[in-house]
């Protein structure tokens, strides 16, 4: 009986040792952005079919809207001031925009590797319209009033 137990233990041990650890795909690590100055971002208003190029300078930026993805017909242009706070271990990078008409947006920069556009990893900024205290503004139906999504490679 002891011999049978030893034999079973030997077979079980041999089987465990022969199991291979599955290969893990290497994780993609992308650098955090320390700044968004002098960068070009893209956005699309799918409801109104407007394609945007958003250019960030040192402290101001410009958002240009086009009627198609080929950027042939410019239909809008507006300027904004912005602040950018780089990410820390505890907090995502923060982005705040204030347009010339006083409309404000606030949100976060999501690191590359979490979203893809055309099968490419992209940095992603998610902004919501906010009041002067930084609180998200909701419409009469309790839905977020306005948001902007933008990305860059």
Where are these regions (language model features)?
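Bacterial Sec-dependent N-terminal signal peptides
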Residues: 3, 15-37, 142-153
């Amino acid at each position: 009986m002891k011999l049978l137990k030893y034999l079973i233990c030997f077979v079980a041990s041999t089987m465990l040792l022969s199991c291979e650890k599955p290969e893990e795909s290497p994780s993609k690590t992308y650098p955090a952005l320390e700044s968004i100055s002098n960068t070009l971002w893209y956005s699309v208003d799918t409801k109104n079919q407007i394609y945007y190029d958003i250019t960030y300078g040192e402290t101001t930026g410009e958002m240009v809207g086009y009627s198609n993805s080929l950027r042939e017909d410019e239909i809008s242009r507006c300027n904004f001031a912005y602040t950018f706070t780089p990410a820390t271990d505890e907090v995502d990078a923060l982005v705040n925009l204030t347009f010339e008409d006083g409309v404000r947006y606030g949100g976060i920069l999501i690191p590359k590797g979490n979203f893809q556009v055309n099968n490419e990893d992209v940095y992603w900024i998610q902004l919501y319209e906010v009041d002067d205290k930084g609180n998200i503004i909701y419409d009469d139906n309790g839905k977020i009033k306005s948001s902007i999504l933008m990305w860059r490679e």
